[in-house]
Amino acid sequence: SLGFDFSKGRLDTSIHPFSGGTPDDVRITTRYDEDDWTGSLMGVIHETGHALYEQGLPIQWRGQPVGAARGMVLHESQSLLMEMQACRSSEFYSFLAPLIATEFSVEGNQWTPEALSRNSRRIVPNFIRVDADELTYPLHVILRYKLERALLGGDLVVSDLPYAWNDAFESSFGIRPPDDLRGCLQDIHWYDGA
């Protein structure tokens, strides 16, 4: 229903959600948490934004600049548009609520479109960027940007990054990462320049 063409792609499971491929073969992966299905849903929606961008590239221009993705900035804009805007809208939850009721055999006030929409917009600080809410997600990006500037400017050495990360995270989010896995090492995208 989001427009992903499964005849030109597929969805699989992995440790961390990602997508990639060519316009005629785009692969999406996600992870599942049986205690919180919403994280999986939003991960799939985010990766679907990437996949739709790839599937929309002109196949006839493959191998030429005009047929290539314009970079990670545009890629992320498309995925975040799907995740943070289109699929957190009341219209989306009006579509989704009956599907949830049918697939999970649930009913009650917490499963109405309005309740699902409110739940998706809760502001709760999270150590993990890809699980962040729509307000704190940009703070994750700003934190990385500031630390990158300090590293590149010579004001921070790599060995001090975990401490600098934890201090800056606590200052911005009000919570302190308990370990590097939920701190400076939690995001594979940061190290590959995305």
PLM regions and their residue ranges:
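Contiguous, non-catalytic segments that form substrate-binding/exosite surfaces or channel walls
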Residues: S1-W37
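Active-site recognition of the HExxH zinc-binding catalytic motif
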Residues: G39-I59, E76-E83, L147
